[in-house]
Design a protein with these regions (language model features):
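Conserved P-loop
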Residues: 22-94, 149-151
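Charged, low-complexity C-terminal accessory regions
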Residues: 17-18, 158
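Single conserved hydrophobic/aromatic residue that forms the stacking wall/gate
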Residues: 1-15
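Amphipathic alpha-helical interface surfaces
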Residues: 35, 83, 87-90, 101, ...
Length: 158
């Protein structure tokens, strides 16, 4: 028989800390506005605090050497990830096979999703459910100004 008093305080407190948190964060900005540098810096800084593994997904290998070696790098172009459904399946597969991921960073998101911001409202709701169920955070760089994005996606802006 398991009693509440048998649970470690870490388990209970980590569950409480996740409640109400936004598990998706988006960095908006046009090309050349510093989004990639910011997301690379965030990924490198998160290695110290992350309770699990840190992943970085991009559409090519150009920033591989900019990341700390503890970060798992995935070049999505090697897996033909182009479109919303393939991207979702790719992410779901990664999370299904790796229970120890605490945060995923995605650069060049619009290139991978191949969609206009207005077409991503329902997709973001699906992504939020996916990463919340996996108890993982998702940080995305989005090559568009925030004012050109639906409000339901803008709420994730950091």
């Amino acid at each position: 028989e398991i009693r509440a008093s048998d649970w470690s305080s870490d388990v209970c407190s980590s569950d409480l800390e996740r409640e109400g948190l936004t598990v998706i964060q988006v960095i908006f900005g046009k090309k050349g506005s510093g989004k990639t540098k910011r997301i690379l810096d965030m990924a490198n800084a998160s290695v110290k605090e992350a309770k699990g593994n840190v992943l970085f997904i991009d559409d090519d290998k150009s920033y591989t050497l900019s990341l700390k070696p503890q970060i798992r790098f995935i070049d999505a172009s090697e897996y033909a990830v182009k479109g919303k459904a393939p991207f979702y399946g790719f992410l779901a597969g990664i999370l299904a096979g790796n229970y120890d991921i605490s945060v995923i960073y995605v650069d060049a998101f619009l290139k991978l999703a191949q969609a206009e911001p207005a077409e991503l409202v329902d997709f973001f709701a699906q992504l939020e459910r996916l990463v919340a169920n996996a108890q993982c955070d998702l940080v995305i760089s989005f090559s568009e100004d925030a004012e050109n994005v639906p409000e339901s996606i803008r709420k994730y802006q950091i």
